[in-house]
């Protein structure tokens, strides 16, 4: 109780338990062909799978923050993802060039300032943050499970991913239909163990 004097911990518990249904998903800043292709070919289709994006949209006040370079829009056209799709799914697209700090190294300032921007948005809205990378592949129910496990609890969580060899992507394609990657936890873990980094 020494960390939260004057019943502040109790206030946080009640706030989370009773009111807070805000989630900001932070896609770690990405640019370049490899990571941008990976976002469109893997992360985005896995976000569309069962009990991920659709479920969390129905049950929470969610925003998905992307921090990308200006070439992102060329890839968006290539993959035929409309602005309407991004808007309907509450994607907020931020261009990395807006986060350059002339007093720092360009690359590190883009990354650091994107994190700071996201943190400020979470604090302002009292929103939980879920961090994902452009090269992640999420199993079905991933976002639902994270939201249900953490909802109503006044503490942080962490999640880890297995690093895998890129040859796993050939097998992942078997799970991709209608621009969705539908794979359950067990199958994804088994595949990751077959293709260690």
Per-region residue spans from a language model:
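Long, contiguous juxta-domain segments that are non-catalytic but functionally important
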Residues: 1-22, 39
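Structural motif
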Residues: 23-25, 128
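Short loop->beta transition adjacent to catalytic acidic/histidine clusters or analogous donor-positioning motifs
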Residues: 24, 50-65
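A conserved hydrophobic helix/loop-capping motif in glycosyltransferases and polysaccharide synthases
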Residues: 26-34
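Short, well-formed alpha-helical segments that are part of the catalytic scaffolds
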Residues: 34-55
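Active-site-proximal specificity loops/subdomain of glycosyltransferases
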Residues: 67-128
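Conserved catalytic core of nucleotide-sugar-dependent glycosyltransferases
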Residues: 102-111, 115, 119-120, 136-197
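Short beta-strand-to-loop acidic/aromatic patch adjacent to the donor-nucleotide binding site
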Residues: 124-139
């Amino acid at each position: 109780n020494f960390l939260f004097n004057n019943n502040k911990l109790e206030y946080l518990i009640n706030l989370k338990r009773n009111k807070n249904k805000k989630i900001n998903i932070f896609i770690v800043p990405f640019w370049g062909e490899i990571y941008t292709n990976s976002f469109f070919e893997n992360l985005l289709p896995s976000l569309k799978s069962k009990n991920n994006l659709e479920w969390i949209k129905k049950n929470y006040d969610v925003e998905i923050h992307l921090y990308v370079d200006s070439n992102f829009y060329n890839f968006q056209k290539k993959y035929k993802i409309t602005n309407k799709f991004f808007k309907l799914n509450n994607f907020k697209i931020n261009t990395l060039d807006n986060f350059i700090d002339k007093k720092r190294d360009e690359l590190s300032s883009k990354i650091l300032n994107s994190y700071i921007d996201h943190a400020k948005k979470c604090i302002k809205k009292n929103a939980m943050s879920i961090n994902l990378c452009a090269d992640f592949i999420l199993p079905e129910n991933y976002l639902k499970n994270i939201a249900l496990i953490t909802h109503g609890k006044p503490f942080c969580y962490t999640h880890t991913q297995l690093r895998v060899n890129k040859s796993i992507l050939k097998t992942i394609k078997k799970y991709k239909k209608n621009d969705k990657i539908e794979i359950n936890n067990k199958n994804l873990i088994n595949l990751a163990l077959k293709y260690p980094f």
